[in-house]
Amino acid sequence: MASTPRTPAPERSPPPVPTPPPPLEDEPPPYLADGSPREEASFSSDGREGAPPKNPQLSPTHHAAPRLVPPPSSPARQDGQEQEGSANKAAAATAEPAREPLRQMATGLARPLSSQTSPATTNSPTPSASPTPSSPAPVANNSKRSGQSTPKRAETKLPLSSPAVAVHFDPVEEAVTSPLRLGKARLDQQQQQQHAAGAAESGASVVPGVAAAVAAVAERRELLLALRLATAVLSLAAFSVIASARTSGWAGDYYARHLQYRYAVAVNVIVFAYSVAQSLGKIRHLVSPRFTFRTMSSYYCSLFLDQVLAYLLMSASSAAASRNDLWVSRFGTDAFVRKITGALWLSFVAFLVLALNAVISXANLFSMV
């Protein structure tokens, strides 16, 4: 199988080589514009003494990140970089300084962007970053104001609190001079004045509620005294007749032999003593004006005792009446049975009068309440 001949490559002209512009005669080389003292001593004004010509000035290299640092270069290249850096510094010094933007580093501190050197422009042979210049320590901000350039709104000054004053607390004085008590007394006084003004306009006398209740109780005091005395007299007559009832002879009888009669005598004695005590109290209220007012406990006690003694007197009279009826059904009627029957009638009447006393006591209690 025959081989196919290859087509020769087309002939191309070589790329043009750029030629640098000729340097001016009266302008010194750029790398000698602002050199180090050693370089100034080595070279003359025309730049032809003692050493070969330097490399032309190169533009600065910008890297994407500090970690992408090129490997260390040769000494000749390092010398060129030093000359390039010195030339850049001289050009920056001769040119008009421009305002550089400030970057906030800390509260109250600002540093220009030029102070932060990039690791790519340093002459260190290692890829480590160059140390930043030492910055002054931040000053303690005692005025509690921000380091920003924008002014803040003036702080409002709060008034100083007055010091606490210790006051002795007297519970008795507080109870007497309490605003609640003073306010209640003032309200009662205003109400009394309003009632008095209304009575003067209408021409009728207005009596406070407590005075009206006391007046109502006083009106029933004579009736209650009469009922107390009647109860005492009836109970006295009842237990006296029962105690005096007896017969002589072999068929004679006596009240102490029967439990029901003894129970009726005991209850009548208690009712008599209670009625006498209540009658003395009513007489004292009628005679002496100092004892016009009574406490609420006395009204409650009177109502309670009236009801309890009325129930006891009713039960005792009923028990004695049942025993007397049994005696009559067995042995007939005689003088002893007739006396017991009369005494039991007096005991029942005393019960009715004592029940009326209980009703009046309840009326007096609810009048005061």
Curated annotation (Swiss-Prot):
Its main location: membrane. InterPro entries: CASP_dom (IPR006702). It holds the Pfam family CASP_dom. It comes from Zea mays (Maize). It is found in: Cell membrane. Residues 244-262, 322-339 are extracellular. One of its GO terms (cellular component) is plasma membrane. Residues 1-162 are annotated as: Disordered. Keywords: Cell membrane, Membrane, Transmembrane, Transmembrane helix. It comes from the Eukaryota. Residues 1-222, 284-300, 361-369 are cytoplasmic. This is CASP-like protein 4U1. Belongs to the Casparian strip membrane proteins (CASP) family. The keyword Glycoprotein does not apply. Coiled coil: none annotated. The keyword Cell membrane applies. Residues 7-23 have a biased composition (Pro residues). Residues 36-51 have a biased composition (Basic and acidic residues). The chain crosses the membrane at residues 223-243, 263-283, 301-321, 340-360.
